[in-house]
Amino acid sequence: MTEPSLPRVGTGVDVHPFEQGRECWVACLLWPGETGLAGHSDGDVASHAACDALLTASGIGDLGAVFGTGRPEWSGASGAALLGETARLLAEGGWLIGNVAVQVVGNRPRMAARRVEAQEAMSAALGAPVNLSATTTDGLGLTGRGEGLAAIATALVTRV
């Protein structure tokens, strides 16, 4: 049976705790003066959630399977590098990326002033449109207490 060429949607989530002494990379941008995020790579929750959503939508796998701690070659990798490799994997698998929407959840860094710059950086790294928004949890949970940062992403892909 031939699979219909309908669009597919994937969701991705990523959460990292803050870690003193690390640079803060979120949405492919360096945030000077902000505490960095712990992680196997750069801790860029926005890029990681976007990759996870794309990998899920395409059925290739998930962030942990493709870039996880069992893959030492990705240790310390940038969110931009992960987005680029994810785009390559999808293209190799016959997928076209429609777009990705990412919402960053946390108190810091404040995304509003650099939102357009972040969208442009993520879109350039991925080679497809990325839209970004941000919110807080009004003091609730680990992001509300300022212990870390989270991101949720939705991706749309279609077969080429």
UniProtKB/Swiss-Prot annotation:
Its cofactor is a divalent metal cation. Its EC number is 4.6.1.12. Pathway: Isoprenoid biosynthesis; isopentenyl diphosphate biosynthesis via DXP pathway; isopentenyl diphosphate from 1-deoxy-D-xylulose 5-phosphate: step 4/6. InterPro entries: MECDP_synthase (IPR003526), MECDP_synthase_sf (IPR036571). A divalent metal cation binds at residues 14, 16, 48. It catalyses: 4-CDP-2-C-methyl-D-erythritol 2-phosphate = 2-C-methyl-D-erythritol 2,4-cyclic diphosphate + CMP. Binds 1 divalent metal cation per subunit. The keyword Lyase applies. Keywords: Isoprene biosynthesis, Lyase, Metal-binding. It comes from the Bacteria. NCBIfam families: ispF. Involved in the biosynthesis of isopentenyl diphosphate (IPP) and dimethylallyl diphosphate (DMAPP), two major building blocks of isoprenoid compounds. Catalyzes the conversion of 4-diphosphocytidyl-2-C-methyl-D-erythritol 2-phosphate (CDP-ME2P) to 2-C-methyl-D-erythritol 2,4-cyclodiphosphate (ME-CPP) with a corresponding release of cytidine 5-monophosphate (CMP). Homotrimer. Belongs to the IspF family. This is 2-C-methyl-D-erythritol 2,4-cyclodiphosphate synthase. The gene is ispF.
